A protein has these predicted regions:
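Short, Lys/Arg-rich flexible segments
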Residues: 1-99, 103-164
Length: 164
């Protein structure tokens, strides 16, 4: 019987070395979360990528961009990361309906200041609103160039870890 033995110690040591050098992924995940946040902010700056549906009444809020009347939604976009994940999100309660679109529930509108509301020259103590159809304006999306930036960041991390 012929027996061939291969010493794989060098290979195993090399693999262990690679595992050691790539074990701290926290800086990478932090960078990926920042890249994703910047991509979302770019979506706001561009008015959507691709462009979002225009306002139903364009002159109503002239000057402010879509989804940016107060800036609250845009400013709420926050990155977070751990050693194993990179996440971008928002805690604004109306974010989902603007991102995915949908129909708001029927509701009653009451005056905030004063005793009555004025609609079309008429006054009312309350108005029964049937709800609004909100078009989808996806702002939490990555474009191909954003995805490439993520791939480049991972490649740079691996190159640095492997000494390339």
């Amino acid at each position: 019987m012929i027996e061939i033995k291969i010493n794989t110690d060098a290979l195993q040591n090399g693999l262990n070395n690679i595992a050691q050098r790539t074990s701290n992924t926290r800086p990478l995940m932090t960078q990926l979360a920042r890249i994703m946040r910047n991509a979302v902010l770019d979506n706001f700056e561009a008015g959507g990528r691709p462009a979002w549906a225009p306002r139903k009444y364009p002159s109503a809020r002239e000057g402010s961009g879509l989804l940016q009347d107060s800036g609250r939604l845009r400013n709420s976009i926050t990155p977070s990361s751990t050693a194993t994940e990179a996440v971008v999100g928002t805690n604004v309660e109306y974010a989902a309906i603007h991102h995915f679109g949908g129909q708001t529930a029927p509701h009653t509108i009451l005056p905030k200041n004063g005793k009555a509301l004025k609609f079309g020259g008429r006054f009312a103590k309350r108005v029964n609103h049937s709800g609004s159809k909100i078009p989808a304006r996806p702002f939490m999306v990555l474009q191909p160039d954003d995805e490439q930036a993520l791939v480049d960041a991972v490649n740079d991390y691996l190159d640095a870890a492997l000494g390339n």
